[in-house]
């Protein structure tokens, strides 16, 4: 079996043991760093659950980025915060929109829900929300599984004093104020993450594996469409996220490890699962 097949098999068996809510879909969260295989895993689970006659709706945290105009305004209003000059971190998503969509599924609404998608190719790679005519439509009442994936799904804000102390002992001490801003915004995501019934965490055995994984992704993309970021740009891109991993992953992993409704999958450098529990 491939690494993906092993992981999918483990998750399907895990899901069989989880209590299912009545009158609404089961909401499965998938969290993992860039390049860990979240989207590929979500698609594979979608396929396998559909084969079992489940009705599946799949979407990503990325689908709920602010519109291009909103992101430009956010960056303009926070010129001294390098962490929000581009999409990615907490504060750059439409949390109200996302919360409303998940609320519809949690309530088992019989009204059709529209789920956006984000077109990262727009505005020269700066990105914008895709045309509404291409949004996904779903009926929460007839949906049995929602798969919601994202790199920071499940992250919890730290005490601001604790974050300041930790930031000052790292190479990110010069952006302490920016880190605190993002940390405050992370609180807005908690009502969203609390709607998840079970969380699967894809965890890198060594967080620096993310650089290699993201480079592999970009090389594959460039081979397919003949455009993309240089290696230097990819490294800078990952650098943007690295303080978030360093400050928040420990808390998430501890929470997942102790929760019987969560599944921790630790990956080696080749994305092979070395621990699944």
UniProtKB/Swiss-Prot annotation:
What InterPro entries would the database entry show? P-loop_NTPase, Zeta_toxin_domain
**Binding-site residues, ATP:** 32-39
Instruction: Respond yes or no to whether keyword Transferase is given for this record.
Output: yes
Q: Where in the cell is it found?
A: Cytoplasm; Nucleus
The residues that cross the membrane are: none
In which family does this protein belong, per the annotation? Belongs to the GLYK kinase family.
Explain the purpose of this protein.
Has a role in meiosis.
What name does this protein carry? Uncharacterized kinase mug58
Source species, please? Answer: Schizosaccharomyces pombe (strain 972 / ATCC 24843) (Fission yeast)
């Amino acid at each position: 079996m491939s690494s993906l097949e092993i992981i999918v098999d483990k998750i399907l068996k895990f899901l069989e043991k989880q209590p299912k809510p009545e009158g609404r879909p089961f909401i499965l969260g998938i969290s993992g760093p860039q390049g860990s295989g979240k989207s590929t895993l979500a698609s594979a689970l979608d396929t396998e659950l559909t084969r079992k006659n489940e009705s599946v709706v799949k979407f990503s945290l990325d689908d709920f980025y602010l519109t291009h105009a909103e992101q430009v305004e956010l960056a303009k209003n926070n010129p001294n915060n390098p962490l929000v000059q581009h999409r990615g971190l907490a504060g750059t998503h439409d949390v109200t929109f996302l919360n409303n969509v998940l609320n519809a599924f949690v309530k088992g609404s019989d009204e059709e829900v529209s789920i956006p998608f984000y077109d990262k190719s727009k505005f020269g790679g700066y990105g914008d929300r895709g045309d509404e005519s291409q949004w996904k439509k779903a009926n929460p009442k007839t949906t049995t599984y929602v798969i919601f994936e994202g790199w920071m799904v499940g992250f919890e804000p730290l005490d601001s004093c604790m974050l300041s102390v930790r930031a000052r002992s790292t190479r990110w001490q010069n952006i302490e104020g920016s880190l605190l801003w993002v940390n405050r915004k992370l609180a807005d995501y908690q009502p969203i993450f609390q709607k998840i019934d079970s969380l699967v965490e894809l965890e890198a055995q060594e967080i620096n594996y993310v650089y290699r994984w993201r480079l592999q992704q970009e090389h594959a993309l460039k081979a397919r469409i003949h455009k993309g970021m240089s290696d230097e740009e990819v490294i800078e891109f990952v650098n943007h996220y690295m303080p978030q991993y360093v400050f928040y992953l420990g808390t998430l992993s501890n929470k997942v490890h102790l929760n019987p409704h969560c599944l921790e999958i630790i990956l080696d450098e080749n994305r092979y699962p070395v621990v699944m529990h």
